[in-house]
Amino acid sequence: MKRIAFVFSTAPHGTAAGREGLDALLATSALTDDLAVFFIADGVFQLLPGQKPDAVLARDYIATFKLLGLYDIEQCWVCAASLRERGLDPQTPFVVEATPLEADALRRELANYDVILRF
């Protein structure tokens, strides 16, 4: 089976991309164990706890990221440069444990995947 990477690059709640990406990720995990999750650019905001999506009449799907471990999704990466650009600390308690990688290392890791789905 092909290796599949899910890349979250959009902020949560502005569009349905994050929610749809998470749904696709969980569904795909039933078919293969060979997948990983990458958080880049504004996608790093998907990792923040304590969001208030009800204020913009959006569904709170962020807590569902906590289920990744139950679905045996253990390869989670976050772009260290994206965190810095947005004033976030890699030591922040994110909703899912994601390993920070610098941009070059993240690109090398992403190159190991056959299919890349971006949300």
Curated annotation (Swiss-Prot):
Source taxonomy: Bacteria, Pseudomonadati, Pseudomonadota, Gammaproteobacteria, Enterobacterales
What is the role of the protein in this entry? Part of a sulfur-relay system required for 2-thiolation of 5-methylaminomethyl-2-thiouridine (mnm(5)s(2)U) at tRNA wobble positions.
The protein's assembly and partners: Heterohexamer, formed by a dimer of trimers. The hexameric TusBCD complex contains 2 copies each of TusB, TusC and TusD. The TusBCD complex interacts with TusE.
Record's PANTHER family? PROTEIN TUSC
Q: Which family does it belong to?
A: Belongs to the DsrF/TusC family.
**Any GO BP:** tRNA wobble position uridine thiolation
| GO cellular component term, pick one | sulfurtransferase complex
- Pfam short name (any one): DsrE
Gene name of the encoded protein: tusC
- Per the record, the domain of life is Bacteria
Protein name per its UniProtKB record: Protein TusC
Alphabetized, the UniProt keywords read:
Cytoplasm, tRNA processing
Compartments it resides in: Cytoplasm
Q: Show the Gene3D superfamilies listed in the entry.
A: DsrEFH-like
